[in-house]
A protein has these predicted regions:
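Cytochrome P450 heme-thiolate monooxygenase catalytic core
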Residues: 134-319, 336-337
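Conserved cytochrome P450 K-helix/beta-meander segment immediately N-terminal to the heme-binding cysteine loop
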Residues: 423-465
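C-terminal helix/juxtamembrane-tail motif
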Residues: 10, 413, 521-539
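Conserved cytochrome P450 K-helix E-x-x-R motif and the immediately C-terminal K′/meander segment
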Residues: 46-54, 348-411, 432, 465
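Cytochrome P450 heme-binding "Cys pocket" and the immediately downstream C-terminal segment
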Residues: 470-471, 477, 482, 488-524
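Cytochrome P450 catalytic-core helices
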Residues: 315-341, 486-506
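N-terminal membrane-proximal hinge/A-helix region immediately C-terminal to the signal-anchor transmembrane segment
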Residues: 3-111
Length: 539
């Protein structure tokens, strides 16, 4: 009986797969397409996804094609991938009720993804105010994370690996080096910055926020592995093996008194804004929840904050890989030029900054020259970061969308509702017709020397080049068009400010144990990267 039941399930699954595949039969396939044989391709995609996506880009130029994956959350495991600029344009113009990128986050999130408005409106609208908070936390975080002071007993701790959790107890004198696990150190630093943007200072000093937000990256990514399991098993496996539920509950406990305080003040001021109202992500999330008519409970708001923390993975990874790329080459190639640009821009902005009133004098002295406009003027740094994002993109496809209603590309290709659609970013990023020497890292690829001839007035310098936040047909890291990532502006300022401060204040180098892949398109083992830091020695 058991064997018969298993056979019945397999036959039923096979028949359903045949039916669903028939709806996609008109779309060309890379690899096997028959239900059982297609799993061979699916396992190959798990291990060699980049190579297969590049092969599909060459085999089906400017066309739409499909490949079988183990992602059962997709339309029966099939990814439909679009090649070429016209396909990207078609997708970018599709309305949200036809193509939805939020459908992957679960029903309670996707029914009303109001947290997107928090990023798009609250954070972007208040970017100048947020930048001041961001800068101060980055400065303080780096001083704590890379704080090169004496250990108290006078003994140098150089050339020893120092775990982030024990950093303050094993630090060397200023002239010595401290070795850190690069990826984890930068991730925890970014989590501290995000915590300050969420709840503000001094609440963000609670280390629980850093632990939760840094852990969110790991746990949400672990949750993606659930896609290979049948739908009915996912809730059980999630409860047993994924720690997101406990972290979200702990985050809810932390923000509950802060939400109550906001509501008390609102009641006192008859619902109107008041001068001391927090200007942070938590407050904006509460406002958006009300406007959307959804739950204001701490656990529901905590879910949104936790989900948004997933962006820390890309932010911290970019900072770490930028330091890696700077370290594997002589300083004369990129490091010296970018350091000089940072120094020059900060001095220039400080010179042009208006004199503050007495109340703002302390902030002015602390932050002299470190303004949002200064980061906008660091064009070599911007180009370098943009190239890191392109060259080290860890996703072969972008602009993932669930097709909610039947969709037709401009060339007539029909995509049925229920399908999962992506854009072939890897193919475009490596296309020699779009980018010269695309398989080679060129940190100043997006930097144009002729812009140096423009007048030096600050306002005319801003936006003089093609910044990393501007999407293009050959650059899909942040998406494209109206489906582009709304948080890319905040992410950009965190990445560039953190790098600029490190370049200004610290010397750094990779340890001998870190494997280097210079001039070859191979990703380093990010979990094993170690880097030495010391207070910058002036020459």
């Amino acid at each position: 009986m058991i064997v018969q039941a298993i056979l019945a399930i397999l036959i039923t699954h096979y028949c359903i797969s045949l039916y669903r595949r028939s709806k996609l039969r008109h779309i060309p396939t890379l690899g096997y397409s028959w239900p059982l044989l297609s799993y061979i391709t699916a396992f190959k995609y798990e291990k060699h996804g980049f190579k297969l996506v590049e092969e599909g880009y060459r085999k089906f130029p400017n066309k739409v094609w499909k490949i079988r994956t183990l992602d059962e959350q997709a339309g029966d495991g099939w990814y439909i991938i679009a090649n070429g600029t016209q396909s990207v344009e078609d997708i970018s113009k599709a309305p949200n009720d036809q193509l939805s990128s939020t459908i992957f986050f679960g029903s309670d999130i996707t029914t009303n993804p109001y947290h997107v408005n928090v990023v798009r409106l609250g954070m972007k609208k208040n970017i100048v105010l947020q930048y001041h908070e961001m800068y101060r936390e980055i400065r303080d975080t780096l001083e704590d994370s890379l704080k090169l002071t004496s250990t108290g007993d006078g003994e140098a701790q150089s050339e020893k690996t120092c775990p982030f959790s024990r950093l303050l107890t094993c630090l060397p004198p200023p002239s010595e080096w401290v070795t850190l696990p690069l990826s984890q150190t930068i991730l925890e630093a970014c989590a501290r910055v995000y915590a300050r943007l969420v709840v503000g200072h001094p609440h963000s000093e609670n280390p629980e926020y850093t632990r939760i937000f840094a852990g969110a990256v790991k746990h949400i990514l672990e949750g993606k592995n659930l896609r290979v399991y049948p739908k009915f098993l996912r809730p059980f496996i999630s409860r047993v093996s994924i720690k997101t539920h406990g972290d979200i509950q702990r985050l809810a406990d932390l923000i509950e008194p802060l939400l109550k305080a906001i509501k008390r003040e609102e009641k006192k001021h008859n619902g109107d804004d008041w001068p001391e109202k927090p200007r942070n992500i938590l407050s904006w999330t509460l406002d958006e929840a009300r406007r959307s008519g959804v739950s204001e409970l701490p656990c529901d708001i905590a879910k949104r904050l936790y989900l948004t923390a997933l962006s820390l993975e890309g932010i911290s990874r970019t900072v770490a890989l930028a330091l890696y790329e700077l370290s594997i080459r002589p300083a004369s190639v990129y490091l010296n030029d970018i350091r000089e640009e940072v120094r020059t821009v900060i001095e220039e902005v400080a010179r042009f900054s208006p004199a503050p009133n007495q109340d703002a004098l302390k902030l002015y002295e602390e932050q002299r020259g470190w303004e949002k406009i200064a980061i906008d003027m660091m064009h070599k740094l911007d180009s370098f970061v943009k190239e890191v994002l392109r060259y080290h993109d860890n996703q072969p496809v972008h602009l993932g969308s669930r097709v909610l209603k039947d969709f037709v590309f401009s060339d007539g290709t029909f995509i049925p509702a229920g399908s999962t659609l992506f854009v072939n970013s890897r193919g475009a990023h490596m296309d020699e017709e779009l980018l010269e020497n695309a398989d080679t890292f060129n940190g100043f690829r997006y930097f144009k020397e002729q812009d140096q001839d423009q007048p030096r007035a600050l306002a005319e310098q801003v936006g003089a080049r093609d910044p990393l936040t501007r999407t293009a047909f050959a650059y899909y890291t942040f998406g494209y068009g109206k489906h582009a990532c709304p948080g890319r502006f905040t992410a950009s300022y965190i990445i560039k400010t953190m790098l600029a401060r490190i370049l200004t204040d610290y010397d750094f180098e990779l340890t001998e144990s870190t494997q280097v892949y210079a001039e070859t398109h191979r990703f380093p083992d990010e979990s094993a990267m170690e880097m030495r830091f010391r207070k910058k020695v002036e020459e």
